Structures are given as C-alpha cells and as structure tokens.
Amino acid sequence: MNLKNVAFALLGVTLFACAPKQKPEEKIEPVAVQKASDKKVYMHMMTWFETKETNQHPDPKYVGKWGCHWTMDTCNPDSIDANGLQNIASYYHPLTGAYYSGDKNIIEYQLLLMKLAGVDGIIFDYTTLNPAWDFPMLIRNTDSIESQTQKIGLDFCILYEDQHIRDAANRNEVTDNEKNPCSKVERARLDMEYIRDRYMSQPNYIHIDGDPLLLDFGPQTFYSEAEWDTIFSVFPVKPVFFTLWYQSKPCGKNAQGEYSWIWKDHVAGLKHFYNTYEYDGLKMASAYPGFVDFYKDGGWGDGIGWNIPHRGDTTLVETLSEALNSNLDIIQLATWNDYGEGTMFEPTVEFGFTFLATLQKMLGVQNLNEDDLKLCFDLYQARVKYASSPETQAKLDRASALMAALRTAEAREIIDGLDK
C-alpha cells in the first residue's frame, strides 16, 4: 500500500470515528390510565360491521354489498341526506361514517378512545365458528381487533353467543370446522377449543382469581348442566363463567356468575339485581347510555316494544352511578357500537364525545380530558388523509404509540404539525 492509500485509509477511519452516533429509536410502551375508581371497566363490543369492499358473506348474493348491520332490510348507506348523513340502520351515526370492523385505522381509533376514556378492556360479542351466514367475518374481525389490544394496553375476554348455534340448527346448518354435519353441543365444544387456543392463551386475556373469564349472552341454546359439562370438557381448568342475569341455574356448577344487562325497568331492575337479588355466585354490574332500537324501521320485525331515551348523558349517569355505588368489582359498558339498538358509547354525530367524556369524569380519570378523546378522531382523519404517504404514516405510528403511553401533548404536536 502506497502512502497516498494509507492517508486515505486513515482519513476514512478518522471520519468514521468522528461521525455522530445515531440515536437509538425510543421504544414507547403503553401506560395504564390512573383513575379514582378501582373497579374494572370493560366495554362490550360488536365486530359485525362490513362495507361493500369487505363483505365476504358465504352467500354470493350478499358479496359486494353493505353488511346487514348497516342496512337491515330498509337502508342503504350509499344514500346521503341533505345533512350529509348516511341512510344506515340506526337513528345515530358514527363520526367516522359507516365502517368495516376490521379496518386497521378504525381499530386504532376505537381502542385509543376506550383507553383514554378509562376503559380497562373489551368484552367481545362473539359468535360461533360455524361457517354459515356472516359468522366467519365476525371471527376475522374479532381476531383483527384483538391483535391490536396489547399494543394499546387493553385487556379482553369473550362473550359467547350460543344462540347463533340455535339459529344455525333451525336451518339445518350446524357443521364442524370441516363443514361436516355435527351436533349443537359438538359445535360449541369446537368453538371452546378455538377460544382456549386463540384467545385465552394471550397474556392480556382477562382472568378472575387466576382463571379466564368467559361470558354467555344467555344461555339461549344449551339448558342443561350436562351439555355445558361436555362443551367445557376442552378446558384443563374451567373458565369463570358468567351468564345473563337470572339465567345461570341451567348451567349448574359450570356457572360462577351473572351479569346485568339492559331492560325496560331500567334503574329499578339494576338496583334489584345489585341489592336485593339473593345469589351465591359473582355478579357483574352494567352501565349504558340509552336504548332506542331501529328494528321496526329497519324491517326486522315489530321492534323491542320499549325504549330508554338517552336524555343527553342522563341515562348514562344514572346507570353508571348505580354500578359505581354497588359492591360489585366489574362494570360492563353496554355497548360500544350496537347502533341498531342505540346503545353506543362510540362518538356519533348526534352525541359527539359526550358519553366517553362523562365516563372519564365519573371514573375519575386523571390527567386526560375530552380534548384527548378528540385527538383520537384527529389521528383517524390524518390516517385517511395521508394514506398514500409512508413517511407521514410513520409519524402517525409514533403519535399513536404516544397516545397509548398517555403522552397526548407530544402526539398532538405531531398531528397538528402535519399540515404546516
């Protein structure tokens, strides 16, 4: 090597040694929300919404059409009224417009809203894996949402809808995972295998005293202890199983608890369940913002026949107050997004962020307010606006992580700075 080459080599070493070291990228972890209330608060969530682009219904005549939970039998979300509102199967309209439950931007928006409102986790309204109707899409969407819960810092569990097996049986469509005919009990047992392996194995699955929590919206299909013994035979240790209020007896020793729900007697019914009803098992409280169903106008029968008006946030204040003042440790919020029954906590054109802001205040959420909830919508809008910009999406990834870490001021700087 000649002297000139040596000089260049030494210069290269010197420049390399003097180059500034790249700062390692900060790893941002989710942070738990601090609240005055020590009760666990879980949000009941529907995962059944489909758009024309995402509807993969097993029946070809529904493919490429809006999902039935946006349309029922009378509505068309493509029809927009003079106020810019979609014609959906509800008297209330999500701020985002009608959406696909598996949309990653919708999922991020919804989970961050729950987190910043003081919600500890999600109770997924869950169907069967029976490959009929829209059931496979609900499972797909649930899996998509669940996969993002840890990143945001939310726990979750499953609420099983055994009535869907009854519905499939009424049409002779109960099958196993390979689409071979099987019994209703066998179908439910196979569902429990999937729930055990896919969900209960996750580190953020909700447990009570060390055992996984499982709820049922009923029972409405299986009414004997022997049936539930068989259904639960897949578990090495049986889950802590809650049924609807007053419905646990048919399950025998398999049921350890009951949860309250929405009924026409409203607060009187909640008070009776919390304070008067003598029950040796566990109880779970509930709170809801109202109940106004769309079924009759949607062409799905004659409707429920009663309603509970929202009255602003008055109904929520009434029901949440009863739950917080009870001696029960868990509150289920009913619901995040059952638009057909008008029970949604999700921000709408009609109510804005009212229900989540009220939830923040009543739970005593610290260092967060309604402006932080609105930031979630700003993030969602930015995701959509800059969908084709990988550079901007990377910035929004950081903003999302900061929000999950409760560093909302920093996230706001990123989002507000995008248009500058």
Q: What function would you assign to each model-found segment?
A:
Residues 1-7:
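Bacterial N-terminal signal peptides that target proteins for export
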Residues 10-13:
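Short, linear, compositionally biased motifs with a strong N-terminal bias
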Residues 16-17:
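C-terminal motif of bacterial Sec signal peptides marking the signal peptidase cleavage site
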Residues 26-420:
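Glycan-processing catalytic domains of CAZymes
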